[in-house]
Amino acid sequence: CVQVCDKIQSLNIWDLEGTGSRSTINVTGNRTIREADCSLCGQCITHCPVGALHERDDTEKLWRALADPNKTVVVQVAPAVRAAWGEGLGFTREEATIGKIFDALKKMGADYVFDSCFTADLTIMEEANELLVRLGKGELKDRPMFTSCCPGWIRFVKSEFPHFVNQLSTAKSPMQMFGAVMKSYFAEQIGKKPEDIFSVAIMPC
């Protein structure tokens, strides 16, 4: 985990402290992960040889929402998940259809299931419009405008290349855009309060 963070990701979040049997791995400078300039890429988790690190698991929250009759559960499925989900289960491409994911989610109790491609299109349109406006104002003479589609990328730019922050698009990521649309326009269309909608994202990262 230390090596992948230092040598591959170049973030230097982790420190090896102590010697021999007293060796421990801690966040540099005795900080918490929240205080460190971690991009939350997850590489330390996938490379941890002893399983000491793990990702956040919101499965129980989802089960509670599915069991709550007052919650409307709305799920978005990312294109990458749609394309690759069957590999881990040994399905062929022909067997691993998006319909099977949607059917499984509906049988588990999801009220609505959507493909994230819709909000990816919204993000692209928002970014394209912003690019034209910024070009017209002369704000992008020296550098391009960078996408804001990935929260990990945003954190990485802020910590490692703060001079590029002004070059980032202000558009939300497709996942965030989906949540905003579900809690505003969609909630209004189905006659629900935003707080009664439980938005779920099934993402590859």
What is the role of each PLM region?
Residues 31, 41, 98-99:
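Generic non-transmembrane alpha-helix signal with a bias for helix starts/N-cap capping motifs
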Residues 1, 5, 38-44, 48, ...:
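Short cysteine clusters
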Residues 10, 44, 49, 109, ...:
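Short loop/turn motifs at secondary-structure junctions
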Residues 55-204:
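Iron-sulfur-associated redox domains of electron-transfer enzymes in respiratory
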Residues 9, 48, 186-190:
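Structural motif corresponding to the C-terminal cap of alpha-helices
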Residues 7-37, 51-73:
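Non-heme iron-sulfur electron-transfer modules
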